[in-house]
Amino acid sequence: MQIFVKTLTGKTITLEVEGSDNIENVKAKIQDKEGIPPDQQRLIFAGKQLEDGRTLSDYNIQKESTLHLVLRLRGGMQIFVKTLTGKTITLEVEGSDNIENVKAKIQDKEGIPPDQQRLIFAGKQLEDGRTLSDYNIQKESTLHLVLRLRGGMQIFVKTLTGKTITLEVEGSDNIENVKAKIQDKEGIPPDQQRLIFAGKQLEDGRTLSDYNIQKESTLHLVLRLRGGMQIFVKTLTGKTITLEVEGSDNIENVKAKIQDKEGIPPDQQRLIFAGKQLEDGRTLSDYNIQKESTLHLVLRLRGGMQIFVKTLTGKTITLEVECSDNIENVKAKIQDKEGIPPDQQRLIFAGKQLEDGRTLSDYNIQKESTLHLVLRLRGGN
């Protein structure tokens, strides 16, 4: 049966239960759905508070009954924490909680490490080892949260697109660290970043202090294409892929980049430029491939063929196979594409059911042949 649980905020939760479930079980289900620990839950039905050891049947709770959920604060209070941005966070606390605990709760909610938090109440900065009671902080008191930057500063990084990134840094951070922070935020590899301040390009080994970069300074980020060029790769489907390359990259590297972007294994790639197939060991420069050149990508099927698999719903699946593939391999490829377990697949060709241990060649299955897929229901044969 289903029952409903209504909270003080007016939200209604639906639970699947049995009459024999005890109240403890019901609280565990509420915890699963809402994350509220059982010891903070009070459940009320027909004006009565329900006891953990009793069952729903004991209280004559039937399908589609509505329980009311009231939160029991263990130490009995809520407090508020206001940030400099004006956001207010609500915390459930006890008078005996120390300031360290409170900072940990703020970290849980907001992700701000405790060592970057300063909490202020009644104009005083609160010390970690003291408790809320020590400072006479009572229910619904408001604390103020100020961020302590360890080295004490924020700087800005402006990109060529006009976007501004804010970073938390210390004067002692070196430029390499700053580039790593930019990579964390924006995903740009450090070796593609050039940082400019006051007209100077910043060197990795130097620190922000070395360049007299102070709080709220703005750096400019310019992207460095390592070898300095972009090329395009056009597929037979008409899709164009953009790659960042260097003239000294060999064709093998280029195929690896295509694999990273598109997932196509290098041994299935043939690259064509100016009518010539490019060889793995040669470089882009060898072929006079320059910035914004377009290569053409043709897929090489290793065993050299495509076959089709038609399902009872009329859907046709295309598979890349080799004549030497056995039927088991083919079923595994169908599983990869369609999620159908091999043991539920029966494959038919030319009126014959294909056996797992045999190969496509055994059945004279050639390129562009069509197999038929019939589902075998596990209970059947």
From Swiss-Prot:
Entry-linked CDD domains: Ubl_ubiquitin
Residue location of crosslink Glycyl lysine isopeptide (Gly-Lys) (interchain with K-? in acceptor proteins): G76
Keyword set, alphabetical order: Cytoplasm, Isopeptide bond, Nucleus, Repeat, Ubl conjugation
GO cellular component, one term: cytoplasm
Residue ranges of the propeptide: 381
InterPro entries: Ubiquitin-like_dom, Ubiquitin-like_domsf, Ubiquitin_CS, Ubiquitin_dom, Ubiquitin_ubiquitin-like
Further remarks about this protein from its record: Ubiquitin is synthesized as a polyubiquitin precursor with exact head to tail repeats. Some ubiquitin genes contain a single copy of ubiquitin fused to a ribosomal protein. In D.discoideum there are 9 genes: ubqA: 5 copies of Ub and a final Asn; ubqB: 1 copy of Ub and ribosomal protein eL40; ubqC: 1 copy of Ub and ribosomal protein eS31; ubqD: 3 copies of Ub and a final Leu; ubqF: 7 copies of Ub and a final Asn; ubqG: 5 copies of Ub and a final Leu; ubqH: 5 copies of Ub and a final Asn; ubqI: 4 copies of Ub and a final Asn; ubqJ: 4 copies of Ub and a final Asn. For the sake of clarity sequence features are annotated only for the first chain, and are not repeated for each of the following chains.
Function statement: Ubiquitin exists either covalently attached to another protein, or free (unanchored). When covalently bound, it is conjugated to target proteins via an isopeptide bond either as a monomer (monoubiquitin), a polymer linked via different Lys residues of the ubiquitin (polyubiquitin chains) or a linear polymer linked via the initiator Met of the ubiquitin (linear polyubiquitin chains). Polyubiquitin chains, when attached to a target protein, have different functions depending on the Lys residue of the ubiquitin that is linked: Lys-48-linked is involved in protein degradation via the proteasome.
UniProt similarity note: Belongs to the ubiquitin family.
UniProt protein name: Polyubiquitin-H
Biological source species: Dictyostelium discoideum
Name of the gene encoding the protein in the UniProt record: ubqH
